[in-house]
Each structure stands twice: as structure tokens, then as C-alpha cells.
Amino acid sequence: MNVKENPYLKYLRRDRLPHIFCAGCGNGIVLNTFFKGMEMAGVDFDSIAMVSGIGCSSRIPGYVKCDSLHTTHGRPIAFATGLKLANPSLNVVVFTGDGDAAAIGGNHLIHGARKNIDLTVICINNSIYGMTGGQISPTSPEGSFGTTAPYGALEDPFDLSELVRAAGASYVARWTAAHPLQLANSIKKGLKNRGFSFIEAVSQCPTYFGRKNRMRSPVEMMKFMKENSINRRKALKMDPEEVEGKLIIGEFADAPRPELCDRIYGMIEEKSGKIDIIKSAYRDD
């Protein structure tokens, strides 16, 4: 039997395979949608630079055949900001997770959005710390179980997409691993947006979140995400009681505004007239 090869294998470092992800993990689905979105956006793969922090999702760039930075916990957006300011011609993509981005990296997240620097941040939200043993994260639903919450989480979770929208990101969307086509389309829009783009990919972690919350099967978890989701356009017309406990998906912001690199280089050019000298370091000649 002839087996057709995945067309996106050309973007992977095959010598790094097999990957470390657990069976049923959603990270592979999200990476696949990234490649699809990148091709849909017409972005040159050679212009991609990936940045990540610490966590399961942050291991993704190591498998991709592009320049990448594997940085310290919670700091990928800070590193990515420096990279983008130094070389604005790059398409800088951040892969991060709910713990990396919303806990130790929370301030970098909101200030990156506020500054509207041209980064595409893909946050894989599985509502738990997967790499370190199943601890509760800032997005764990109230009442969910984890290593640090044997009697259930007592704290209200962050709504990451609403948080980043309120902080000023010019493009924000949330989908799940069970919505790959929509996710790929939002990644395309994020890559084409000149500004801070935040794409939240709600994903399954069967090893820790699933096992500790009586959803052992990845299929069961994906079915739950699919059936428990409601589009934001529809949710905004419903009473709060009707959407309680639902996963709100869709676009949260699509409002272009001036981008940080453009502002900084514009100011330099206006005040000194030396913008060509500064940018010459990144020219082929």
C-alpha cells in the first residue's frame, strides 16, 4: 500500500525525530495548522524565526527547520521583542503555553500586546503544567484537578484571549485542536497582521489533565472541546448564564493600529535621518 507523505515534513528536522510529545497530545495538530497557515499567508519560510520558553509546547521550534531561540521560562516574548526590533524583516513567531505565557511570563504578554510589536504568538493552552508533573496553571478551570489541587482548583482562571484583547493586541483569536481549519486560518491572519497577533489554541493533555479529570482518551477530550465550544459572535448575544462553562471560540480582535517597530524606526528617521544606516546591516549587499 502506498502511503502519502505529509507535505509539511519538508519543514521538519527529521534527525530530531521521534518527538517527545505524549500519545494524543495536541501539539502536533497545532504545528500542522501553523504550517498550513504559513503557506496560506504566503510567508517565506526562510524569513521565519521561532522563539519559545519552557514547557511542552516550547519544544516545538526545536523540530522545525528554521532559526530559533529556546529561551528561559516565561521570557520568549521579551526575547522575540529584541529579535524583531533588531531585524524587522523577520517573521518572528512565538510558541508558548498557558503556564509559560500567563504565569511567569504574564507581564511580557500584556506589554507585548500593549506595544503592538509585530509578533505572532501561538499559545497552546492545555490548562495544566504538562512538563513538570500536572500542576494547576493560570487557565485551569475552577474545580479541575491537578497535582497541586487534589481537591480541585479554587481560583478563577484567566481568559487569555480577552486579557490580551484588553491589553491592546491588534489581532486575537481562540480555537481548539478540534478546529484545525479555523485555527490555520487565524494563524494566516496573524502572520499577515502588522502588529501583535495572539492565537490561543486550546489543546488536550491526556497524560495529566485528562487523567486527573476523568477524561483519559484524547478522542474524548477533543469531542468535549468540539461540543462545548460556542462562537464568540453568538455568545455576545446570549445571557451570561447560557454561556457559563462554555468555551468561547472565534476572533476576539481584528483592529490594526500603528506597530512598534514602525514607530521606533520612523522616529529615528525623523530625528536623525539615518534610518538607512541602521537598516543596512540586514541587507544582502
From Swiss-Prot:
Q: What EC number(s) would the UniProt record show?
A: 1.2.7.3
> Does the record bear Oxidoreductase in its keywords?
yes
Q: Give one GO biological process term.
A: organic acid metabolic process
Alphabetical list of CDD domains matching this protein: TPP_OGFOR
Catalytic reaction(s) noted: 2 oxidized [2Fe-2S]-[ferredoxin] + 2-oxoglutarate + CoA = succinyl-CoA + 2 reduced [2Fe-2S]-[ferredoxin] + CO2 + H(+)
Q: Which Gene3D superfamilies match?
A: 3.40.50.970
InterPro entries found in the cross-reference section: 2-oxoacid:Fd_oxidoreductase (IPR051457), THDP-binding (IPR029061), TPP_enzyme_TPP-bd (IPR011766)
Q: What pH dependence is recorded for this entry?
A: Optimum pH is 9.
Q: Which UniProt keywords apply?
A: Oxidoreductase
Which enzyme type, at the first EC level? oxidoreductase
Q: What is this protein called?
A: 2-oxoglutarate synthase subunit KorB
